[in-house]
Protein backbone atom coordinates (compact mmCIF):
# COMPACT_ATOMS: atom_id res chain seq x y z
CA UNK A 1 0.00 0.00 0.00
CA UNK A 2 1.15 3.34 -0.79
CA UNK A 3 1.29 6.28 1.33
CA UNK A 4 -1.54 7.81 -0.44
CA UNK A 5 -3.74 4.84 0.12
CA UNK A 6 -2.82 4.86 3.80
CA UNK A 7 -3.78 8.46 4.02
CA UNK A 8 -7.10 7.76 2.34
CA UNK A 9 -7.71 4.83 4.69
CA UNK A 10 -6.77 6.92 7.69
CA UNK A 11 -8.96 9.70 6.51
CA UNK A 12 -11.84 7.27 5.95
CA UNK A 13 -11.29 5.85 9.45
CA UNK A 14 -11.28 9.33 10.94
CA UNK A 15 -14.50 10.17 9.13
CA UNK A 16 -16.03 6.90 10.25
CA UNK A 17 -14.94 7.56 13.87
CA UNK A 18 -16.32 11.10 13.67
CA UNK A 19 -19.62 9.75 12.30
CA UNK A 20 -19.80 7.19 15.11
CA UNK A 21 -19.07 9.87 17.70
CA UNK A 22 -21.74 12.05 16.11
CA UNK A 23 -24.21 9.15 16.07
CA UNK A 24 -23.37 8.41 19.68
CA UNK A 25 -23.88 12.07 20.55
CA UNK A 26 -27.19 12.14 18.71
CA UNK A 27 -28.17 8.84 20.32
CA UNK A 28 -27.22 10.17 23.71
CA UNK A 29 -29.29 13.32 23.16
CA UNK A 30 -32.25 11.16 22.12
CA UNK A 31 -31.70 8.93 25.14
CA UNK A 32 -31.59 11.96 27.40
CA UNK A 33 -34.81 13.33 25.90
CA UNK A 34 -36.44 9.91 26.16
CA UNK A 35 -35.26 9.53 29.76
CA UNK A 36 -36.56 13.00 30.60
CA UNK A 37 -39.92 12.16 29.03
CA UNK A 38 -39.97 8.84 30.90
CA UNK A 39 -39.13 10.63 34.15
CA UNK A 40 -41.87 13.19 33.50
CA UNK A 41 -44.33 10.39 32.70
CA UNK A 42 -43.34 8.47 35.81
CA UNK A 43 -43.72 11.62 37.91
CA UNK A 44 -47.11 12.31 36.33
CA UNK A 45 -48.18 8.69 36.96
CA UNK A 46 -47.03 8.90 40.58
CA UNK A 47 -48.90 12.20 40.96
CA UNK A 48 -52.06 10.73 39.44
CA UNK A 49 -51.80 7.61 41.61
CA UNK A 50 -51.46 9.80 44.71
CA UNK A 51 -54.47 11.85 43.60
CA UNK A 52 -56.42 8.63 42.98
CA UNK A 53 -55.57 7.30 46.44
CA UNK A 54 -56.58 10.61 48.01
CA UNK A 55 -59.85 10.60 46.05
CA UNK A 56 -60.58 7.01 47.06
CA UNK A 57 -59.91 7.90 50.70
CA UNK A 58 -62.26 10.90 50.42
CA UNK A 59 -64.95 8.74 48.81
CA UNK A 60 -64.63 6.13 51.57
CA UNK A 61 -64.78 8.86 54.22
CA UNK A 62 -67.87 10.36 52.60
CA UNK A 63 -69.52 6.93 52.34
CA UNK A 64 -68.84 6.41 56.04
CA UNK A 65 -70.30 9.85 56.76
CA UNK A 66 -73.40 9.03 54.74
CA UNK A 67 -73.84 5.71 56.57
CA UNK A 68 -73.42 7.44 59.94
CA UNK A 69 -75.91 10.13 58.92
CA UNK A 70 -78.43 7.51 57.80
CA UNK A 71 -77.99 5.62 61.08
CA UNK A 72 -78.40 8.85 63.05
CA UNK A 73 -81.57 9.74 61.13
CA UNK A 74 -82.95 6.24 61.74
CA UNK A 75 -82.09 6.45 65.45
CA UNK A 76 -83.68 9.89 65.68
CA UNK A 77 -86.82 8.63 63.92
CA UNK A 78 -87.04 5.65 66.28
CA UNK A 79 -86.45 7.85 69.36
CA UNK A 80 -89.08 10.30 68.15
CA UNK A 81 -91.59 7.50 67.62
CA UNK A 82 -90.85 6.17 71.11
CA UNK A 83 -91.24 9.63 72.64
CA UNK A 84 -94.52 10.17 70.78
CA UNK A 85 -95.73 6.76 71.91
CA UNK A 86 -94.74 7.55 75.51
CA UNK A 87 -96.46 10.94 75.36
CA UNK A 88 -99.59 9.35 73.92
CA UNK A 89 -99.63 6.67 76.63
CA UNK A 90 -99.00 9.26 79.33
CA UNK A 91 -101.81 11.48 78.03
CA UNK A 92 -104.12 8.49 77.78
CA UNK A 93 -103.24 7.38 81.31
CA UNK A 94 -103.83 10.88 82.66
CA UNK A 95 -107.15 11.04 80.82
CA UNK A 96 -108.17 7.63 82.15
CA UNK A 97 -107.18 8.63 85.68
CA UNK A 98 -109.48 11.63 85.40
CA UNK A 99 -112.35 9.47 84.08
CA UNK A 100 -112.06 6.79 86.76
CA UNK A 101 -113.82 8.81 89.46
CA UNK A 102 -116.69 9.48 87.05
CA UNK A 103 -117.05 5.77 86.32
CA UNK A 104 -116.80 4.93 90.03
CA UNK A 105 -119.46 7.52 90.88
CA UNK A 106 -121.78 6.14 88.22
CA UNK A 107 -121.30 2.63 89.67
CA UNK A 108 -122.04 3.94 93.17
CA UNK A 109 -125.18 5.65 91.88
CA UNK A 110 -126.33 2.39 90.27
CA UNK A 111 -125.69 0.46 93.51
CA UNK A 112 -127.41 3.08 95.68
CA UNK A 113 -130.50 3.42 93.49
CA UNK A 114 -133.70 1.66 94.42
CA UNK A 115 -134.27 -0.55 91.37
CA UNK A 116 -137.79 -1.41 92.55
CA UNK A 117 -139.06 2.17 92.56
CA UNK A 118 -140.96 3.06 89.40
CA UNK A 119 -140.00 6.71 89.75
CA UNK A 120 -136.26 5.90 89.84
CA UNK A 121 -136.24 3.22 87.09
CA UNK A 122 -135.91 5.62 84.11
CA UNK A 123 -133.19 7.57 85.88
CA UNK A 124 -131.37 4.35 86.79
CA UNK A 125 -131.55 3.18 83.17
CA UNK A 126 -130.02 6.48 82.04
CA UNK A 127 -127.21 6.18 84.58
CA UNK A 128 -126.59 2.54 83.53
CA UNK A 129 -126.44 3.55 79.84
CA UNK A 130 -124.10 6.42 80.66
CA UNK A 131 -121.89 4.03 82.65
CA UNK A 132 -121.88 1.49 79.81
CA UNK A 133 -121.00 4.21 77.28
CA UNK A 134 -118.12 5.45 79.45
CA UNK A 135 -116.74 1.94 79.88
CA UNK A 136 -117.07 1.22 76.13
CA UNK A 137 -115.29 4.44 75.15
CA UNK A 138 -112.46 3.80 77.59
CA UNK A 139 -112.07 0.20 76.38
CA UNK A 140 -111.90 1.45 72.76
CA UNK A 141 -108.60 3.05 73.66
CA UNK A 142 -107.22 -0.22 75.01
CA UNK A 143 -107.86 0.45 78.68
CA UNK A 144 -109.36 -2.36 80.70
CA UNK A 145 -110.85 -2.22 84.13
CA UNK A 146 -108.76 -3.87 86.80
CA UNK A 147 -110.78 -5.43 89.59
CA UNK A 148 -108.43 -7.09 92.07
CA UNK A 149 -111.18 -8.17 94.44
CA UNK A 150 -110.37 -11.64 95.81
CA UNK A 151 -106.78 -11.51 94.54
CA UNK A 152 -103.64 -11.35 96.70
CA UNK A 153 -102.66 -7.82 97.72
CA UNK A 154 -99.79 -6.41 95.61
CA UNK A 155 -98.33 -3.15 96.97
CA UNK A 156 -97.02 -2.26 93.51
CA UNK A 157 -100.55 -2.23 92.09
CA UNK A 158 -102.86 -1.78 95.07
CA UNK A 159 -103.25 0.84 97.74
CA UNK A 160 -104.52 -0.49 101.07
CA UNK A 161 -107.16 1.71 102.68
CA UNK A 162 -107.64 -0.53 105.71
CA UNK A 163 -106.83 -3.99 106.98
CA UNK A 164 -109.56 -6.33 108.20
CA UNK A 165 -109.55 -9.89 109.33
CA UNK A 166 -112.05 -12.18 107.69
CA UNK A 167 -112.65 -15.89 108.08
CA UNK A 168 -113.93 -15.96 104.47
CA UNK A 169 -110.69 -14.60 102.94
CA UNK A 170 -107.05 -15.59 103.13
CA UNK A 171 -104.52 -13.25 104.69
CA UNK A 172 -103.38 -10.35 102.44
CA UNK A 173 -106.32 -10.71 100.07
CA UNK A 174 -108.19 -7.75 98.58
CA UNK A 175 -111.68 -7.94 100.07
CA UNK A 176 -113.29 -4.79 98.71
CA UNK A 177 -112.35 -2.31 95.96
CA UNK A 178 -113.07 1.30 96.79
CA UNK A 179 -111.81 2.76 93.52
CA UNK A 180 -111.08 0.68 90.45
CA UNK A 181 -108.13 1.19 88.18
CA UNK A 182 -107.62 0.88 84.45
CA UNK A 183 -104.73 -0.59 82.57
UniProtKB/Swiss-Prot annotation:
Gene Ontology BP annotations: protein folding
Organism of provenance: Vibrio vulnificus (strain CMCP6)
NCBIfam families: PRK14150.1 (NF010748)
Protein's job: Participates actively in the response to hyperosmotic and heat shock by preventing the aggregation of stress-denatured proteins, in association with DnaK and GrpE. It is the nucleotide exchange factor for DnaK and may function as a thermosensor. Unfolded proteins bind initially to DnaJ; upon interaction with the DnaJ-bound protein, DnaK hydrolyzes its bound ATP, resulting in the formation of a stable complex. GrpE releases ADP from DnaK; ATP binding to DnaK triggers the release of the substrate protein, thus completing the reaction cycle.
Keywords: Chaperone, Cytoplasm, Stress response
Family: Belongs to the GrpE family.
Compositionally biased region (Basic and acidic residues): 1-14
GO molecular function, one term: unfolded protein binding
Coiled coil residues, start to end: none
Places the protein is found: Cytoplasm
InterPro entries: GrpE (IPR000740), GrpE_coiled_coil (IPR013805), GrpE_head (IPR009012)
Protein name stated in the entry: Protein GrpE
Example of a GO cellular component annotation carried by this entry: cytosol
Chain residue ranges for the region called Disordered: 1-20
Gene3D superfamilies: 3.90.20.20, Head domain of nucleotide exchange factor GrpE
UniProt keyword Cytoplasm, yes or no: yes
Subunit structure, interactors included: Homodimer.
Major localization listed first in the record, in broad terms: cytoplasm
Pfam families: GrpE
Amino acid sequence: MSNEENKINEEALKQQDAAEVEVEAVGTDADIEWNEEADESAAKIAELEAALLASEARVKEQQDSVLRAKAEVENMRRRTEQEIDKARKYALNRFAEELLPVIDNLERAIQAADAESEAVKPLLEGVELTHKTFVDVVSKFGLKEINPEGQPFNPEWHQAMSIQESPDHESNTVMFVMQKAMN
